[in-house]
């Protein structure tokens, strides 16, 4: 493990946020000597961010906890194009009113994680439409475009992936990389930003911005990426059988959010406690050492702490109480129906019918479409959802009062 001097990089390193840094020694020295400003960009493609963006939000939180200034960059300009990075096809283009509404909704998420204001290390939210919408095409090509090599841009993994699959990459999307690099330059001029944070899939875009700032302004700026977030099962973070796990409470209830974290794989508990909670490392080590059924206590603490950050302490307490009443007390007090499954998986529709929770497959599908079906407390909205049967009991619910258990057998 690298021995960093700055509180910021030590914090990121010990909790597992660092994948790559462009010049770790120089960045560490700068962060140890003065307050730095760093940013992450988020495209407002929906009315909320989902759990897949939470690692980046937590990196900004760690930045502020270490005494530095977080800049939340909303892609009101780039969002009109869409980031092609590692996407199989072009994104649907959004109109300006939708983008503005999405940004207003997303800001509510950040207010739970960051302190906004006018202080030296208070967070600021800015929209890149402020400068991108005003760009003049010919001057931009002349002043900025000359610093980019098409040959090099074609070598980026995010572009090669599309081209290797013989999938179209529009000129519109190709320009995204130049605009994102220009964001870094503009933020360094406006706010003195010297660091861009992002996921590992953004490495090429970040390096573009670093080189542009050096060539146009002679500035030394840095990039730092986090690891690709997947679960122990190899699944991309943030998706469940019920769809995306949104961070806004009106799109994913605090209870459903709590259940998402409660259902964490045993092998992910320690890592998620470090990344997604503020618990001290010694407490996390104690929880990670729990074995057998005791690991469930660590999962409940993870769920409580993660929900507290996203929705507040009261919402977390209510979600935990609801889960206990619905899940634990119900299981202990009721003679729940049990279905033994010899195969490695079973469809949710078959499980609902087999447990006698609904009368027919048609009713099961209606139950799922209406949002009344749950797997281990998580809402399941996909009629084709398949449940992987493991050694642990799997609780299936139809509505608030009808529950059953699937067991391997």
UniProtKB/Swiss-Prot annotation:
Superkingdom to which the source organism belongs: Bacteria
Mind naming one GO cellular-component term on file for this protein? Answer: cytosol
Q: Which GO terms describe its biological process?
A: tyrosyl-tRNA aminoacylation
> Where ATP is bound, by residue?
239
Record's catalysed reaction(s): tRNA(Tyr) + L-tyrosine + ATP = L-tyrosyl-tRNA(Tyr) + AMP + diphosphate + H(+)
Q: What class of enzyme is it?
A: ligase
SUPFAM superfamilies documented for this protein: Alpha-L RNA-binding motif (SSF55174), Nucleotidylyl transferase (SSF52374)
Can you say where in the cell this protein is located?
Answer: Cytoplasm
Q: Where does L-tyrosine bind?
A: 39, 176, 180
Q: Which residues form the S4 RNA-binding domain?
A: 346-408
**Name the UniProt record assigns to this protein:** Tyrosine--tRNA ligase
Its lineage opens with: Bacteria, Pseudomonadati, Pseudomonadota, Alphaproteobacteria, Sphingomonadales
């Amino acid at each position: 493990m690298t021995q960093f001097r700055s509180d910021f990089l030590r914090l990121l390193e010990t909790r597992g946020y660092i994948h790559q840094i462009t010049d770790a020694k120089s960045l560490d020295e700068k962060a140890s000597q003065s307050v730095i400003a760093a940013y992450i960009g988020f495209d407002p493609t929906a009315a909320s961010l989902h759990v897949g963006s939470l690692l980046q939000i937590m990196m900004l939180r760690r930045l502020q906890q270490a005494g530095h200034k977080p800049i939340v960059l909303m892609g009101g300009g780039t969002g009109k194009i869409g980031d092609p990075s590692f996407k199989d096809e072009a994104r649907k283009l959004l109109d300006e009113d939708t983008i503005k509404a999405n940004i207003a909704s997303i800001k509510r998420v950040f207010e739970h994680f960051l302190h906004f204001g006018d202080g030296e290390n208070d967070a600021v939210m800015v929209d890149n439409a402020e400068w991108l919408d005003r760009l003049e095409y010919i001057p931009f090509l002349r002043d900025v475009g000359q610093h980019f090599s098409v040959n090099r841009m074609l070598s980026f993994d995010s572009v090669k992936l599309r081209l290797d699959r013989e999938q179209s990459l529009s000129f519109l999307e190709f320009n995204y990389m130049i605009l994102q690099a220009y964001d870094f330059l503009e933020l360094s001029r406006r706010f003195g930003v010297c660091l861009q944070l992002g996921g590992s899939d953004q490495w090429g875009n970040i390096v573009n911005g670093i080189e542009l700032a050096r060539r146009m302004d002679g500035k030394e700026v840095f990039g730092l990426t986090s690891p690709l977030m997947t679960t122990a099962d190899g699944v991309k973070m943030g998706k469940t059988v019920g769809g995306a796990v949104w961070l806004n409470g009106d799109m994913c209830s605090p209870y459903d959010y709590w259940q998402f974290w409660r259902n964490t794989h045993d092998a992910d508990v320690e890592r998620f406690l470090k990344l997604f909670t503020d618990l001290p490392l010694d407490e996390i080590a104690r929880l990670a050492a729990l074995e057998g059924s005791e690991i469930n206590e660590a999962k409940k603490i993870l769920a409580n702490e993660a929900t507290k950050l996203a929705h507040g302490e009261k919402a977390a307490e209510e979600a935990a109480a609801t889960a206990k009443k619905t899940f634990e007390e119900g299981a202990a007090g009721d003679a729940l129906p049990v279905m033994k499954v010899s195969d490695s998986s079973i469809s949710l529709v078959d499980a609902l019918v087999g447990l006698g929770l609904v009368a027919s497959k048609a009713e099961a599908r209606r139950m799922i479409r209406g949002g009344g079906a749950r797997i281990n407390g998580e809402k399941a909205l996909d009629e084709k959802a398949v449940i992987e049967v493991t050694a642990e009991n799997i609780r299936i619910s139809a509505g608030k009062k009808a529950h059953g258990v699937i067991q391997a057998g």
